[in-house]
């Protein structure tokens, strides 16, 4: 897996997300707001976003993504499909807004391997004509490093085994793996860098057989800027006040262990200045805007690409901005706000 897998490719548009944004575009059109309606249309047609395979039922969306990628290739495009592998048993053990369908106490580890990872891997291996970037288990390593509850501590060993298994099953030249390492606000502190590298080393050891990953993902579903010259006060004392610096710091910790050093960084949603009073605020942060769309021009040799992972407009949970629905449900008022505050590259 040498070379940047995103180089010369475009991140595939997520057709499911695009159709959800129809409601947002109509809301702007009904108010005669052509400017923001045009921005939504740009996101729908031009901005690639990862597909979330967050339970066993949603494995079918891999087939949709593969179909869409083949259609794009037939039109002369050169797509890479972004997928999020996210169904760890006892996942989100610390926050609980996104707990999943599998429980370690109910045969969750075996079910994860046999009913989720195996079919996931089979679908990707069968589509050897398509390039895939797969983010593995957002937030899991964050919880392993900092999760102090008995629930998180008990989940740690089996979860390491589970992620190692997923890595071992997804070894193929057209599959590029990025193990999630939370974000700079969570693991970017000086005393967290080394434990994070240790956790990664343990997981790769469990993957066995010289299993390879391309690197790491960060800021998935979070709101940190890619780079800033004016970091908010709550970052004071951290060597990782933005995600580019976080990537550099983690890369240095990984390099010392002979581990991979490349990153992809989610910029689907970025908090506006003053939106957060503390770094730990992660839920429907208000105000925020759509961030930098997909690019490989990252100004950081450790960053393969800036990507959109979280579909902006899907709620983080019943928290943050008023009126928020349950995690994953569509929150149109939020999508409208993201559009109004969108990055300059999104059509004006």
From Swiss-Prot:
What does the UniProt keyword field contain? Answer: Carbohydrate metabolism, Cellulose degradation, Glycosidase, Hydrolase, Polysaccharide degradation
- Catalytic activities: Endohydrolysis of (1->4)-beta-D-glucosidic linkages in cellulose, lichenin and cereal beta-D-glucans
Active site location? 92 (proton donor), 139 (proton donor)
Which residues bind substrate per the record? 52, 54, 183, 186, 222, 282, 310, 314
Which terms does the UniProt entry file under GO BP? Answer: cellulose catabolic process
Keyword Hydrolase found: yes
* InterPro entries linked to this entry: Beta_cellobiohydrolase, Beta_cellobiohydrolase_sf, Glyco_hydro_6_CS
Q: Which Pfam families match?
A: Glyco_hydro_6
Region (Disordered) residue ranges read 222-244
Q: Where is the composition biased (Low complexity)?
A: 222-241
Class of enzymatic activity (EC top level): hydrolase
Picking any one GO molecular function of the record gives: cellulase activity
| Enzyme Commission (EC) number | 3.2.1.4
Q: Per the similarity annotation, which family is this?
A: Belongs to the glycosyl hydrolase 6 (cellulase B) family.
Q: What does this protein do?
A: Plays a central role in the recycling of plant biomass. The biological conversion of cellulose to glucose generally requires three types of hydrolytic enzymes: (1) Endoglucanases which cut internal beta-1,4-glucosidic bonds; (2) Exocellobiohydrolases that cut the disaccharide cellobiose from the non-reducing end of the cellulose polymer chain; (3) Beta-1,4-glucosidases which hydrolyze the cellobiose and other short cello-oligosaccharides to glucose.
Q: Provide the assembly information.
A: Monomer.
Q: What is this protein called?
A: Endoglucanase-6B
* Organism annotation: Humicola insolens (Soft-rot fungus)
